[in-house]
Amino acid sequence: NNYFNDTYQGIPIGGYNRLIEGLLEGVDTQVNTDFFADREKWEAVADKIVFTGKIDEYYDYRFVKLDYRTVRFETETIDTANYQGNAVINYTDRETPYTRVIEHKHFESFGQAVYDNPKTVISREYSTEWQDGMEPFYPINDDKNTALYQQYKQLADHETNVIFGGRLAEYKYYDMAPIIEKVLELEM
C-alpha cells in the first residue's frame, strides 16, 4: 500500500537544498528576498523573472485574494531507533487529526544505519486554513477560486518578461516529479 503510485520514488542524495544549490552555482540569483519590497529594482535588472509566489499578490490582489490551505508541523525527538519504518506515512481517515507523519532519518538512512542512532525525529503535519501572515502551501480547487485564478491568468498570459511557475503562481497542486519535468521543458 503506497500513497504514491509512481514507478520510481526517491530524493536526491543530500536532499533538494543541496541539489538546488548545485544547479544555481555560478548563476546570478537572489533568494530570501522580498520581491515586492523593491519590485521596480528587480524588474529593471532582470530580462526575465521567474515568479513562484502568489499570482494574486503579484497583481496586488486586483480582483480579490485567492484562498489557500497551509500546514503546520509538530516535531519531536523520540527515544526509539525506528518509529514507523518509512520516511512518510499518510493518514486519510477522518479520525486522525494530522495528514502525515514524517520520520526524517528514513530519507537517507537505510538498513542497519537506521538503528545506529537510538533516537529518531518525527514531524506530524496538520492541514489548516490559511490566513494572512501564514505561508500558503496549497491552492483551493473549487469553482470560485478556479474562476478567480483564470482572471489572474489572463493578465499573466500578457506578460512577456515573467514566467509564472509552481503551486502559488499557477494556482495548481504539483507533486515534485511533474514540476521538475515542467521546469526542464521551459523555454526561456
Where is each model-derived feature located?
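Active-site/ligand-binding neighborhood in enzyme catalytic cores
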Residues: 1-48, 52, 56-59
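Aromatic-acidic/polar surface patches that form glycan- and anion
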Residues: 9-16, 90-91, 172-179
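Short, loop-centered acidic/histidine patches that primarily coordinate divalent metals
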Residues: 14, 104, 126-127, 166-169
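Mid-domain catalytic core of redox enzymes
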Residues: 36, 40-155
